[in-house]
Design a protein with these regions (language model features):
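Non-cytosolic head/periplasmic domains of membrane-anchored proteins
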Residues: 41-150
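Structural motif
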Residues: 28-30, 66-70, 105-112, 155-167, ...
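A short beta-strand motif characteristic of beta-propeller blades
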Residues: 1-7, 35-43, 74-81, 119-129, ...
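Blade-level signature of beta-propeller repeat domains, shared across WD40, Kelch, NHL, RCC1
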Residues: 297, 302, 306-337
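Acidic, serine/threonine- and glycine-rich low-complexity intrinsically disordered segments
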Residues: 132-256
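Repeated scaffold domains used in trafficking and secretory/extracellular systems
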Residues: 5-16, 44-56, 84-95, 129-139, ...
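Extracytoplasmic/periplasmic/luminal assembly and interaction segments
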Residues: 6-56, 62-63, 259
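Hydrophobic beta-strand positions that form the internal "hydrophobic ladder"
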Residues: 20-21, 58, 96-98, 144-147, ...
Length: 337
């Protein structure tokens, strides 16, 4: 129903930043509103940018580099100099950043206040392989109070994973290293940990999904085991979705949808080679550059159709019937009848 021409440089990635459009590449980042109006841009030099988004705040760092830019829709909030090579990072909605850093003798997890320019961490954690394992995934809660870490280690020849929670608020102050709860899992790897909101988190391993509840000391509330190969994990504050290769041969993929309490509420088969899956309000939006399928949370089709030109990003809006589309040369608005 509307289109605005924009110039998008080749090799630029696009992400939804709380309804605005974040563009980033090796050379810099910029932000536009959903009507195509430029809000800010920041140039930098990165070899392989890594991005974390929480609500309206994002952190951009360079894998193996030492700089992290913390931004929101209004521009740069602060720049962090880590002094050690960055392996991964996670930002909270309040601009606090957890960064996994490579030190020659150990791996460090440092937490920074990214709301100003800093090279001083507010929390230092030194991790050694023989004691706690290697941190393969880190996530901050939206309010920045809890950090969730998945560790992996070999224990006398067998694989072991451990999920730990650290509380940087009053509850964690009296605990050693702010550690408030943790769980061990044998013979599995947990490469994905994520907060859905401030009191619900989940983890996906190669054979299960685990839900945790609690805004101070998270505890396990539900676990579901699976046999099939995990292809992707998607979530919002209310739902989590895991995509598998479909073993039955009926379709290419299978999407299992879970509520925040860890109940599996729906399974749907997917034949589309999708580029992203978005949970928005009570909808599931599955799309690639050419086509789009929108269902309700229980899989009933609300819309199935094709785009007029290739789409790199679909943006849900406040209306459940209106979506922004970023193409190679425009930002369009699509409205469902």
């Amino acid at each position: 129903i509307a289109t605005v021409p924009v110039t998008i440089v080749q090799g630029t990635k696009t992400e939804d930043l709380d309804g605005n459009i974040l563009f980033y590449s090796k050379d810099g980042a910029s932000c536009m509103d959903n009507k195509g109006k430029a809000i800010w841009n920041q140039s930098y030099e990165m070899q392989s940018p890594i991005l974390s988004i929480s609500g309206a705040v994002c952190a951009l760092g360079d894998y193996n580099g030492r700089e992290i830019y913390v931004c929101d829709k209004n521009g740069i909030r602060g720049t962090i100099n880590t002094n050690l090579p960055i392996r991964s990072l996670s930002v909270a909605e309040n601009g606090v950043v957890a960064a996994v850093l490579d030190d020659s003798s150990a791996t460090r997890i440092n937490v920074y206040n990214g709301n100003s320019n800093t090279d001083e961490a507010i929390v230092h954690a030194k991790v050694s392989m023989d004691k706690s394992g290697y941190p393969i995934s880190v996530c901050m809660s939206p309010n920045g109070r809890i950090m969730m870490v998945s560790y992996f280690f070999m224990d006398s020849g067998s694989m072991k994973s451990s999920i730990a929670f650290y509380n940087f608020g009053e509850v964690g102050e009296n605990q050693t290293d702010n550690y408030v709860s943790g769980y061990d899992y044998l013979n599995t790897v947990v490469p994905y940990v994520q907060f859905m909101n401030n009191s619900v988190a989940f983890a996906v391993s190669d054979d299960r999904i685990i839900f945790f509840s609690g805004s101070e000391k998270p505890t396990v509330v539900a676990t579901s085991l699976f046999d099939d190969e995990v292809i992707g994990v998607y979530h919002n504050s209310d739902y989590a979705g895991v995509v598998f290769r479909d073993a039955t041969g009926e379709a290419s993929y299978r999407l299992d949808v879970y509520s925040a309490s860890g109940n599996k509420i729906h399974t749907q088969l997917l034949d589309m080679e999708y580029s992203d899956i978005i949970f928005h309000k009570e909808q599931v939006i599955i799309y690639n550059s050419e086509s789009c399928q929108i269902t309700n949370i229980r899989g009933a089709d609300k819309f199935v159709g094709s785009f007029e030109k290739p789409v790199s990003l679909l943006l849900p809006t406040a209306s459940a019937y209106r979506y922004g589309l970023v193409t190679g040369d425009s930002i369009d608005v699509m409205e469902l009848n």
